[in-house]
């Protein structure tokens, strides 16, 4: 009896190591943005500016939540 040589398959897949993603603290981020938002409200009290700022503020929060 002779031993058969193990043939490496040409398309042999090597197991890739999975990188662990660091989880960001959503609550802390949202709280920081909330403080920032309050600061903006106190500085700009005009109705037109407030509506514009509110819109952008909520857009930013949506992006942050989607990323996390």
UniProtKB/Swiss-Prot annotation:
Keywords: Membrane, Transmembrane, Transmembrane helix. The chain crosses the membrane at residues 27-44. One of its GO terms (cellular component) is membrane. It is a single-pass membrane protein. The keyword Membrane applies. Residues 1-20 are annotated as: Disordered. It is found in: Membrane. This is Putative uncharacterized transmembrane protein DDB_G0285787.
């Amino acid at each position: 009896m002779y031993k058969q040589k193990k043939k490496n398959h040409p398309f042999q897949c090597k197991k890739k190591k999975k990188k662990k993603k660091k989880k960001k603290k959503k609550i802390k981020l949202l709280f920081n943005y909330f403080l920032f938002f309050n600061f903006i409200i106190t500085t700009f009290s005009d109705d037109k500016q407030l509506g514009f700022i509110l819109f952008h503020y909520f857009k930013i929060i949506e992006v942050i939540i989607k990323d996390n």
